[in-house]
A protein has these predicted regions:
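Conserved active-site and SAM-binding loop architecture
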Residues: 1-224
């Protein structure tokens, strides 16, 4: 599509924080989240049709922040329940299986849309064990205080992108504030908000489409 701004797909980015710098820079951005879609499987089908019809199947960048509630090490004491049959609505047998399914949808998007760059984030935990497809693509880890937000929450990124983000380290004077959030329905949403400093740094390192982000691993993936 000639003379169109670049197109970014931001998945499970409920607040739009990670995509915000791209929006501000004039990129065309589509936010896609299970909170919007109802049935996530039907929603994925609609998304594929939308991208293929409206943007000729082209995706320049893909960002993904799958729900971490079955993966994060901070919630390990609940894994046994989340792994148990009956802990999710059909067609899923367990809550963990459902969360793995949401993550593998991102993998399917990468294979189908072949973005110029892509990144998936999750806190320290077991996502790589349950979704081994990600393992060859682990690129970096960070804490929000590395990029200007004064708290800690170690997060890992997988994908093919430029990991040389411009740092802006500050003292983590707010500590591990995410662990202190009150219990309630919004706790997981608040914990999943992408730190704004990291989002800006990621954009600065990953907006120039003249750079070839694709590694040998990704080229092998696309050739398969």
């Amino acid at each position: 599509m000639l003379n169109q701004p670049p197109f970014l797909l931001s998945v499970y980015d409920y607040t739009g924080n990670w995509a915000r710098p791209y929006i501000d820079a004039g990129w065309r951005v589509l936010l896609w989240d299970q909170h919007f879609e109802g049935s996530i499987l039907e929603g994925f089908g609609r998304l594929v049709s939308l991208v293929e019809e409206e943007n000729e199947g082209r995706v320049d960048g893909l960002l993904a922040a799958p729900p971490c509630t079955a993966f994060a090490a901070s919630g390990a004491r609940w894994w046994q329940y989340k792994d148990s049959p009956g802990s999710a609505e059909p067609p899923w047998e367990s809550f963990t299986e459902q969360m793995v399914g949401l993550t593998l949808i991102v993998w399917e998007m990468v294979v189908r849309f072949r973005p110029r760059f892509w990144a998936l984030e999750n806190p320290v935990g077991r996502i790589e064990k349950l979704c081994p497809e990600l393992k060859p693509f682990r690129r970096m880890s960070f804490n929000p205080c590395d990029y200007g937000d004064p708290y800690i929450k170690k997060t890992i990124l997988w994908g093919d992108f430029n990991p040389n983000l411009p740092r802006n380290p500050v003292r983590p004077v707010e500590g591990s504030k995410m662990h202190r959030l009150p219990a309630g329905r919004r706790r997981s949403e608040l914990r999943s908000v992408t730190p704004s400093g990291f989002a800006r740094a990621f954009y600065k390192a990953n907006h120039d489409l003249s750079i070839n982000f694709a590694s040998g691993r990704q080229l092998e993936l696309f050739a398969s």
